[in-house]
């Protein structure tokens, strides 16, 4: 039986569905837009059904397109998996590893982990993707990422199909300017009510990390909506700089402020009788083939945790 599609056509359909644009899909796949359009027309002709809606320069999948995309993603994932299996047989402990991480982890924690892993296993090629927890989890489910460490909430419809393991606790620290009166106290400890007298700098309200911090605060009887938020920024780095310049206070991950603590550009204060933590998780797809490179990285993560305890 001759199949009415090629793997490249499946990749093109997936890219269009992801990018929602012929132009951006062509850029991602490093092909010309006319060539991409021709491939899609050929695919639709051979299948004898429309896969895409093209209205007012907006591209979306038809019902048939959505159904076919599900099978396309599974076919592509199996093809990539078969290549990894064969590569494992040929290379032994050598190979490729695709790691994912949510934003804060990917910026501050993962580089240290990967540096040690690369030192111990220089024969393994590592590719890293940093994005929101939702996007990383979706790519793990689709088989695009081998293993990931995330700190946000994973959507239930994705989480139920993943292997999710609690990894480490990440403490959320309250940082203030060194010139703030609280920083000049001998014991840098405040009570719960003091929080409502601070000027806060936060991430944008639609940020996954901001929502996570707010939810944790609500669970331990804080009312973040009553905080005096004077500034919303789009990155942890910008927030740390603003705090160091004396503009306000902020909650940040403990892993994000090691440099600032060493340089003494900010001050940490504790909240009496309260410790705010979140759980970082290791996620993988139990249905995907697990290469030797993934096993080595997985074991390295747990070794690092056990040696740091």
UniProtKB/Swiss-Prot annotation:
Assigned GO CC terms = chloroplast
Domain named HTH lysR-type is located at: 5-62
Q: Which organism is it from?
A: Trieres chinensis (Marine centric diatom)
Locate the coiled-coil region(s) and give their ranges: none
Please give the DNA-binding region boundaries. Answer: 22-41
PANTHER family cross-referenced by the UniProt entry: HTH-TYPE TRANSCRIPTIONAL REGULATOR, HTH-TYPE TRANSCRIPTIONAL REGULATOR CYSL
Which controlled-vocabulary keywords does the entry list?
Chloroplast, DNA-binding, Plastid, Transcription, Transcription regulation
The beginning of the lineage is: Eukaryota, Sar, Stramenopiles, Ochrophyta, Bacillariophyta
| Family the entry assigns | Belongs to the LysR transcriptional regulatory family.
- Can you name this protein? Probable RuBisCO transcriptional regulator
List, alphabetically, the Pfam families matched: HTH_1, LysR_substrate
């Amino acid at each position: 039986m001759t199949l009415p599609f090629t793997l490249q056509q499946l990749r093109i359909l997936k890219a269009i569905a992801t990018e929602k644009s012929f132009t951006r899909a062509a850029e991602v796949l490093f092909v010309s837009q006319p060539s991409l359009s021709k491939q899609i027309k050929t695919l639709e002709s051979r299948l004898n059904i429309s896969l895409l809606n093209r209205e007012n320069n907006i591209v979306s999948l038809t019902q048939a397109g959505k159904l076919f995309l599900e099978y396309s993603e599974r076919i592509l994932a199996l093809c990539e998996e078969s290549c990894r299996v064969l590569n494992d047989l040929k290379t032994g402990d050598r190979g490729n590893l695709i790691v994912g991480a949510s934003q804060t982890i990917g910026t501050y924690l993962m580089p240290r982990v990967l540096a040690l892993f690369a030192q111990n296993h220089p024969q393994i090629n590592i590719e890293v993707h940093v994005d929101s927890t939702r996007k990383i989890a979706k790519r793990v489910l689709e088989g695009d990422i081998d293993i990931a460490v995330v700190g946000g909430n994973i959507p239930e419809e994705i989480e139920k199909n993943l292997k999710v393991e609690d990894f480490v606790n990440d403490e959320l620290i309250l940082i203030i300017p060194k010139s703030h009166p609280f920083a000049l106290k001998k014991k840098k400890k405040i009570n719960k009510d003091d929080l409502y007298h601070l000027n806060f700098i936060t991430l944008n309200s639609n940020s996954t990390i901001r929502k996570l911090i707010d939810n944790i605060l609500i669970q331990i009887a804080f009312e973040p909506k009553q905080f005096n938020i004077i500034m919303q920024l789009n990155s942890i780095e910008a927030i740390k700089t603003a705090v160091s310049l004396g503009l306000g206070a902020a909650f940040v991950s403990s892993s994000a402020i090691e440099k600032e603590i060493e340089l003494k550009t900010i001050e940490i204060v504790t909240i009496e009788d309260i410790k705010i933590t979140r759980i970082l998780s290791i996620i993988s797809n139990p249905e995907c083939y697990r290469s030797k490179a993934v096993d080595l990285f997985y074991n390295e993560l747990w070794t690092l945790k056990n040696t740091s305890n």
